[in-house]
């Protein structure tokens, strides 16, 4: 697909849609999903919360469980960009439940990682550590060893921030 072979062109193409809000619900949902994937690749901004809420409603009625979990992750991240952390956590919890019910462990790992990031941002390193550990177990279950290593690194960071450097070192060495 163009998204994988040339993400910059995908970004330009998606950006050429002047007013995405004028798209039908189906097309807006697809635009949001593709824009989220481009954001993951190029580290660009996600669609706005209102757009993602429409996409979420569409996927809830017409999408697969994987699509519902993925759009929930994007919506949560968009809430974080808007500094609406409580709303983000609520959406992440719903998306995690959907991902686990559909046994999409890789997606569950990413959702838990973003939840851990929120706890980290709030300075709640104990809850952050637990979420990163949960993410690591889901990544391992999905066979995503690269993301599993990053989650272990994040567990180590949480221990380091909690002044448990000996334990932090153990996790950082596991991640390596």
Residue positions per predicted region:
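A "functional boundary" signal
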Residues: 1-176
């Amino acid at each position: 697909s163009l998204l994988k072979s040339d993400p910059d062109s995908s970004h330009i193409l998606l950006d050429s849609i002047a007013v995405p809000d004028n798209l039908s619900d189906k097309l807006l949902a697809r635009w949001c999903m593709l824009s989220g994937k481009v954001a993951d690749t190029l580290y660009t901004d996600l669609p706005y919360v209102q757009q993602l809420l429409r996409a979420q409603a569409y996927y809830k009625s017409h999408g697969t469980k994987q699509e519902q979990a993925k759009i929930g992750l994007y919506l949560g991240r968009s809430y974080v960009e808007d500094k609406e952390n409580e709303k983000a956590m609520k959406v992440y919890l719903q998306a995690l439940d959907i991902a686990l019910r559909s046994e999409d462990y890789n997606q569950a790992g990413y959702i838990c990682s973003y939840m851990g990031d929120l706890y980290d941002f709030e300075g709640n390193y104990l809850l952050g550590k637990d979420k990163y550990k949960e993410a690591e177990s889901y990544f391992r279950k999905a066979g995503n060893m690269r993301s599993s290593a990053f989650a272990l690194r994040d567990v180590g960071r949480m221990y380091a921030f909690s002044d448990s450097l000996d334990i932090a070192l153990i996790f950082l060495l596991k991640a390596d």
